[in-house]
């Protein structure tokens, strides 16, 4: 009788082909993991955007400890990312030896690269996390692994992904809604990701910088033009940023960014600081009055384009990585720097519903040339900061912590006065763990702390690649 209502024609999860899980993995990575609340909140910490609307982001601007360090703040994103990783782990198992899709190396490589991105987001933001014992049946309390060991695994996932994709294949088909199953594009992505994650570890191992350069060059040679989810129409399907803004109007433009743009006569400035709501006022980081306003503060106009793509890794990020690696080694980085800026400016205008001529782009490059010539590394990093104001704040947050560790300071000074409260630093060096594991997993609960110390480690302890021990 136990099986009387069982549908014998319905396949269980372990019998579903891996390719049918790919689309969901791509959408979740772009929409929930990279461009969801993680990025929305972090954009206040990096001051690339301003939190307004008299609600959660008001508290973030004020650096209210219960919001910044609370376990409930990122619980949805924590759970969504682990859920996506469970899906990707199933794909990898199905495409590995003994799996139902054994030999489908293209699918295996795609899943491995996506898994590297998702694990990267989790450990970059949270530090030491449950990893090696996750998704094991019967283990409801996986141990916490060190970020150093997780990075070893991430880089292996990328290497394995590149190896598998090198064998070609056409098993993904239309289920791959980003690259259409093109393994050459996935291969280029693999090298781009290798450059990104190696650069994160530069503070721990200076010798990786030449490999960062070579991997970036390999990605460019492979034709890398960005990794974007471009499936939205702005009517029945909106990207994550526009959907969030239209439902709440919690995001505004930041004076920290606008001042840098004005200093450089940046053609993106009118689109970044756009008077969309009639208030014609720009957000000043930490200003409680402005953060308390509703539907008043200026916003980047791209937020009003619901059809805009979502970047998982942009073309400009890769060129900025290459330029930084070259500059660190004392090499000529001008061509890479100009390619990075040109790529982003053109993309920014397109997303904002406009276009810019090559002459105007070249004029801007001429305007900022003296800044580059005076200090190439500084201007590379500032321009990357400006370029990543459209949805790439997680990587900026990573850059800030990495560079503060290697260089002692970041070239863009944060202006929010609430970063330094009367009781010490209130700019988080990482994000708190998700509440579901703080409550149910004793290992995470112990790491999170209890009582007055619960979550407070985020203000004092860096992640491993930024010089910390957890």
Describe the residue ranges of each PLM region.
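Residue-level signal for alpha-helical context at structural boundaries
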Residues: 36, 43-44, 134, 172, ...
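Short amphipathic alpha-helical segments enriched in hydrophobics
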Residues: 29, 33, 92-95, 388
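Structured, solvent-exposed acidic/aromatic patches
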Residues: 15-19, 53-352, 371-377, 383, ...
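Composition- and surface-driven signal marking solvent-exposed, interaction-prone regions
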Residues: 332, 336, 394-402
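Amphipathic alpha-helical surface "interface" segments used
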Residues: 46-49, 173-188, 235-241, 361-369, ...
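Membrane-proximal, proline-rich intrinsically disordered regions
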Residues: 1-51, 216-219, 301, 404-470
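Conserved SxxK-family serine transpeptidase/carboxypeptidase catalytic domain
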Residues: 344, 348-399, 410-451
């Amino acid at each position: 009788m136990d099986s009387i209502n069982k549908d014998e024609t319905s396949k269980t999860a372990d019998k579903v082909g891996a390719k049918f899980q790919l689309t969901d993995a791509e959408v979740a990575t772009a929409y929930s993991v990279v461009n969801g609340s993680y990025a929305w909140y972090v954009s206040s910490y990096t001051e690339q955007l301003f939190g307004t609307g008299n609600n959660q982001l008001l508290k973030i601007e004020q650096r209210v400890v219960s919001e910044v360090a609370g376990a409930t703040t990122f619980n949805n994103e924590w759970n969504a990312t682990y859920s996506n990783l469970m899906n990707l782990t199933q794909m990898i198992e199905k495409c590995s030896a003994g799996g139902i899709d054994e030999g489908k190396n293209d699918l295996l490589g795609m899943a491995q690269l996506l898994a590297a991105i998702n694990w990267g987001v989790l450990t970059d933001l949270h530090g030491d996390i449950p990893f090696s014992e996750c998704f094991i049946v019967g283990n409801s309390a996986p141990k916490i692994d060190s970020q150093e060991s997780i990075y070893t695994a991430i880089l292996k996932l990328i290497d394995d992904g590149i190896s598998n994709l090198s064998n070609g294949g056409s098993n993904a088909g239309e289920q791959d809604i980003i690259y259409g199953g093109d393994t050459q594009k996935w291969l280029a992505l693999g090298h781009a990701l290798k450059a990104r994650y190696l650069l994160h570890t530069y503070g721990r191992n200076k010798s990786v910088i030449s490999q960062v350069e070579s991997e970036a060059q390999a990605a460019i040679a492979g034709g890398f033009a960005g990794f974007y989810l471009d499936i939205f129409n702005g009517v029945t399907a909106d990207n994550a940023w526009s959907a969030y803004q239209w439902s709440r109007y919690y995001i505004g433009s930041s004076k920290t960014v606008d001042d840098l743009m004005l200093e450089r006569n940046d053609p993106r400035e009118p689109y970044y600081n756009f008077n969309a709501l009639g208030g014609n006022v720009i957000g000043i980081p930490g200003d409680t009055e402005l953060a308390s306003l509703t539907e008043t503060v200026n916003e980047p106009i791209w937020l009003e384009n619901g059809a805009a793509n979502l970047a998982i890794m942009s073309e400009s990020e890769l060129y900025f990585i290459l330029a930084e690696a070259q500059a660190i080694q004392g090499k000529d980085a001008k061509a890479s720097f100009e390619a990075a800026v040109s790529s982003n400016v053109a993309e920014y205008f397109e997303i904002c519903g406009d276009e810019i001529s090559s002459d105007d782009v070249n004029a801007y490059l001429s305007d900022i040339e003296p800044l580059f010539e005076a200090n190439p590394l500084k201007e590379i990093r500032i321009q990357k900061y400006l370029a990543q104001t459209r949805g790439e704040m997680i990587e900026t947050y990573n850059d800030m912590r990495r560079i503060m560790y290697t260089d002692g300071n970041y070239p863009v000074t944060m202006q929010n006065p609430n970063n330094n409260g009367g009781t010490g630093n209130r700019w988080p060096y990482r994000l708190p763990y998700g509440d579901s594991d703080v409550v149910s997993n004793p290992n995470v609960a112990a790491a999170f702390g209890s009582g007055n110390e619960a979550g407070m480690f985020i203000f004092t302890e860096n992640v491993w690649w930024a010089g910390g021990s957890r």
